[in-house]
């Protein structure tokens, strides 16, 4: 019957997540429980090169479950951590968010056996109301951030946060210089006022590496294969240009900074 065909269709199955841990030190006001962090490691991966960290908003899980995206991340040796419910739209370290994150990564390292998770490079990703946190994560974790993805999202240090409240103040010395960042806006959600803070940011921080993608033909909630492929290509280039075999004194992989003065800059059209 049609019902049985739908039931057994492999296209309807959610993606596999091999491990999970409960986050200590935080109780969600959505569930009145501790959130859960789910970990996906690519098949046959002996050592993880990087982890994409997304909090539960709308499109993060859809991207993580996309078969094309998983296939490309498997080739790169990049895994996923998905936190549900989310813990912080701002990434405010004064609230203990950083400590919760580091404990989560240590717990996932222990339960999975991938000890490198404690210090592996991170790609923060967030959609809509969670689209501001990736930039702030990078500002407070510059040495560990491989790249930043703001999906149908926000500009760094924007005054128009997706969650509708004030943004965090970085201070005079904190920056994301040399870290490739990608701000994605759908064609049918485009608002110039959301882009302007990113243009101003690039002028204020000339060593920053902010890229833009107008997601043609897409709206706020779309996660198309073409978009997933573009993000994968962006991360492939970040891996090839930034990862080194060197390790810092605190055990982190040393990342090469990207120089925006080298390469090509495309004008808007």
Please tell me what each predicted stretch does.
Residues 12-51, 96, 122-145, 149, ...:
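A domain-start/cap signature at the N-terminus of enzymes
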Residues 91-117, 136:
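Alpha/beta-hydrolase active-site loop
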Residues 46-51, 76-81, 118-121, 142-147, ...:
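Loop/turn elements at helix/coil->beta-strand transitions in domains of secreted/extracellular proteins
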Residues 44-92, 157-158, 191-193:
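Short substrate-entry loop that stabilizes the transition state in hydrolases
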């Amino acid at each position: 019957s049609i019902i049985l065909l739908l039931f057994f269709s492999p296209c309807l199955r959610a993606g596999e997540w091999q491990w999970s841990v409960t986050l200590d030190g935080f109780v969600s006001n959505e569930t009145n429980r501790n959130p859960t962090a789910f970990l996906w490691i690519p098949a046959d991966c002996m050592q993880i090169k990087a982890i994409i960290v997304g909090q539960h908003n709308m499109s993060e899980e859809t991207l993580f479950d996309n078969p094309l995206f998983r296939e490309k991340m498997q080739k790169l040796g990049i895994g996923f951590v998905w936190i549900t419910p989310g813990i912080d739209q701002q990434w405010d370290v004064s609230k203990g968010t950083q400590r919760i994150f580091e404990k989560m990564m240590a717990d996932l390292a222990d339960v999975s056996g991938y000890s490198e998770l404690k210090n592996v490079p991170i790609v923060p990703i967030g959609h809509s109301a969670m689209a501001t946190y990736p930039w702030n994560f990078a500002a407070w974790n510059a040495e560990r951030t491989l790249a930043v993805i703001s999906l149908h999202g926000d500009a760094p240090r924007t005054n128009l946060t997706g969650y509708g409240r004030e943004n965090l103040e970085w201070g005079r010395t904190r920056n994301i210089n040399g870290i490739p960042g990608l701000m994605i806006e759908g064609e049918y959600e485009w608002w110039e006022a959301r882009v302007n803070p990113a243009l101003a940011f690039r002028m204020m921080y000339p060593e920053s590496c902010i890229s833009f993608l107008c997601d043609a033909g897409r709206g706020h909630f779309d996660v198309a294969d073409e978009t997933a492929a573009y993000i994968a290509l962006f991360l492939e280039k970040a891996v090839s240009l930034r990862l080194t075999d060197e390790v810092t004194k605190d055990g982190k992989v040393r990342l090469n900074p990207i120089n925006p003065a080298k390469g090509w800059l495309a004008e808007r059209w």
